[in-house]
């Protein structure tokens, strides 16, 4: 094929040969016929790489600022409390990587080994990978278009040497963008257990979550359930609960009932969570008796139970 024009949607895109940028391109007829598309060899390479990962979980949110990365980090912390469980946390929020800060790993660098990129370890059984480790400063902006982001995600999935892992948690950017399509495409052959979707109680967040749920249905991504974050504030003195973000349309609970999706739990606001993230420490250690800690632990157990039942079902399907 000849040189592609600026703005080319790509030969494997649904717009191949039909987009505005395709007009006048010498490859237009070839792309429109579908002959220019070829299977990405990375899909098979990633499938092979992921054979050592038992469970793969995506953490999604419709809107930014609802606590998705905080949840991803503490899901990893919670699962890794069992010293026999190997946990990997992959941050694919390319333009806004906050996992290094939350996990206390700012300033760390990625090292190359004979078997690929080595994760940065919080503990012996908790490894982390993020584009933040590739930046010279945490204040550096990542100004990349879709294809370069997709290439980075492909490299993370194919080249990071996690070893044998029980849980791979993928922290995604908000919304339904190139990053989401890429990770679902590349992991499809490797079998994704499902997605956990974060929201806050107010309708302005829920309307974007409904779009996220629609995205999951369209790409056939199983939904483990929804977590309502910042769900009220429980006073540490009087124990009375106040609604900081009133659920004007019933919150995540009503939405989950309407859409027949599991509500995994509600996490109340706790100032210790923000402080722990800024210090790069586990909130569970900072505030073990907090109602938010209890809510997190209940949600994590439900996710663990889902994965175990999912694995048992898969083993039943492939047994002779």
Curated annotation (Swiss-Prot):
Highest taxon of source: Eukaryota
Annotated GO MF terms: 4 iron, 4 sulfur cluster binding; ATP binding; ATP hydrolysis activity; ATP-dependent FeS chaperone activity; iron-sulfur cluster binding; metal ion binding
Official protein name in the record: Cytosolic Fe-S cluster assembly factor NUBP1
Keyword field: 4Fe-4S, Acetylation, ATP-binding, Cell projection, Cilium, Cilium biogenesis/degradation, Cytoplasm, Cytoskeleton, Iron, Iron-sulfur, Metal-binding, Nucleotide-binding, Nucleus, Phosphoprotein
Keyword Acetylation carried by entry: yes
Gene3D superfamilies: P-loop containing nucleotide triphosphate hydrolases
Subunit structure, as described in the record: Heterotetramer of 2 NUBP1 and 2 NUBP2 chains. Interacts with KIFC1. Interacts with NUBP2. Interacts with the BBS/CCT complex subunit CCT1.
Induction of expression: High and constant expression in cycling cells. Down-regulated upon cell cycle exit and quiescence.
Additional facts recorded: NIH3T3 cells expressing reduced levels of Nubp1 show an increase in number of centrosomes per cell and an increase in the fraction of multinucleated cells.
Protein family according to the UniProt entry: Belongs to the Mrp/NBP35 ATP-binding proteins family. NUBP1/NBP35 subfamily.
């Amino acid at each position: 094929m000849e040189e592609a024009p600026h703005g080319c949607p790509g030969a494997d895109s649904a717009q191949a040969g039909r987009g505005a940028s395709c007009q006048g391109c010498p490859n237009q007829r070839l792309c429109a016929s579908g002959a220019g598309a070829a299977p990405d060899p990375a899909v098979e390479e990633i499938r092979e790489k992921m054979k050592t990962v038992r469970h793969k979980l995506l953490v999604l949110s419709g809107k930014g600022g609802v606590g998705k990365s905080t949840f991803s980090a503490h899901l990893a912390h919670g699962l890794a409390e069992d010293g026999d469980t190997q946990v990997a946390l992959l941050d694919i929020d390319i333009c806004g990587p906050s996992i290094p800060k939350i996990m206390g790993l700012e300033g760390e660098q990625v090292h190359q080994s004979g078997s690929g990129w080595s994760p940065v370890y919080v503990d012996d059984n908790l490894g982390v990978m993020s584009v933040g480790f590739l930046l010279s400063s945490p204040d550096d902006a990542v100004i990349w278009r879709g294809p370069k982001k997709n290439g980075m995600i492909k490299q993370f999935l194919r080249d990071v040497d996690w070893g044998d892992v029980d849980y791979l948690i993928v922290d995604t950017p908000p919304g339904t963008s190139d990053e989401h399509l890429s990770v679902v495409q590349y992991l499809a052959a490797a079998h994704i257990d499902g997605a956990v979707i974060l929201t806050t109680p107010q309708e302005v967040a829920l309307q974007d979550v409904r779009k996220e749920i629609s995205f999951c249905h369209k790409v056939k991504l199983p939904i483990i359930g929804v977590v309502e974050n910042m769900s009220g504030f429980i006073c540490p003195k009087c124990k009375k609960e106040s609604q900081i973000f009133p659920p004007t349309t019933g919150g995540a609970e009503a939405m989950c009932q309407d859409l027949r999706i599991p509500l995994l739990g509600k996490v109340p606001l706790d100032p210790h969570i923000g402080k722990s993230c800024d210090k790069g420490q586990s909130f569970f250690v900072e505030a073990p008796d907090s109602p938010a800690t209890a809510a997190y632990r209940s949600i994590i157990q439900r996710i663990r139970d889902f994965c175990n039942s999912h694995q048992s079902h898969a083993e039943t399907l492939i047994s002779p």
